[in-house]
């Protein structure tokens, strides 16, 4: 079974039907149930979060999408007018407003707390493991630097006496 539902099952079972012979022209719709996300992250990356990350994709105007769906082409003049309006909208920058420093700090701290809630914190066993690895690495590096220092000191004393 695939994400495409019964259409894919029928195509596999029949074998003779191809995408061009279907009424939809090879396109199928996928109906999904809304996903209830946990309040706190579980440590697993989900498919819906990756799909939601593409929110900055350009969205077509409804009139353009409707005309393409019905097969009716738009005039060049209306397309040019729409593109000029879009460029004018992008070119006009919002006025710079004065930011209250207290409100800025409050908003910043609110965002920090929100981001800290998203962090997946280690449990006690993981913390002990990470701490012991860091301490072992630190002891190794201290011994390495001390050994290099002692060795180079002896070498300098032998050469320069």
UniProtKB/Swiss-Prot annotation:
Protein transport recorded as keyword: yes
Membrane-crossing segments per the record: 133-153
Molecular function terms, GO-annotated: protein transmembrane transporter activity
Superkingdom classification of source: Bacteria
GO biological process, one term: protein targeting
Annotated membrane topology: Single-pass membrane protein
Biased composition annotated in UniProt, kind: Acidic residues: 1-12
Subunit structure and binding partners: Component of the Sec protein translocase complex. Heterotrimer consisting of SecY, SecE and SecG subunits. The heterotrimers can form oligomers, although 1 heterotrimer is thought to be able to translocate proteins. Interacts with the ribosome. Interacts with SecDF, and other proteins may be involved. Interacts with SecA.
Function summary: Essential subunit of the Sec protein translocation channel SecYEG. Clamps together the 2 halves of SecY. May contact the channel plug during translocation.
Protein name (record): Protein translocase subunit SecE
Protein's organism: Mycobacterium tuberculosis (strain ATCC 25618 / H37Rv)
């Amino acid at each position: 079974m695939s994400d495409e539902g019964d259409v894919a099952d029928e195509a596999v079972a029949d074998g003779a039907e191809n995408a061009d012979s279907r009424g939809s022209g090879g396109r199928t719709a996928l109906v999904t149930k809304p996903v209830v996300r946990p309040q706190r992250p579980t440590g697993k990356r989900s498919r819906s979060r990756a799909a939601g990350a593409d929110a900055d994709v350009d969205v077509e105007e409804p009139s353009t999408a409707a005309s393409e769906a019905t097969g009716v082409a738009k005039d060049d003049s209306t397309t040019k007018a729409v593109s000029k309006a879009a460029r004018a909208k992008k070119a006009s920058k919002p006025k710079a407003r004065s930011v209250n420093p207290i409100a800025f700090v409050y908003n910043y701290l609110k965002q920090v707390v929100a981001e800290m809630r998203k962090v997946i914190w280690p449990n006690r066993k993981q913390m002990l493991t990470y701490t012991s690895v860091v301490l072992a690495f630190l002891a190794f590096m201290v011994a390495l630097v001390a050994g290099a220092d002692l060795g180079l000191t002896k070498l300098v004393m032998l050469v320069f006496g």
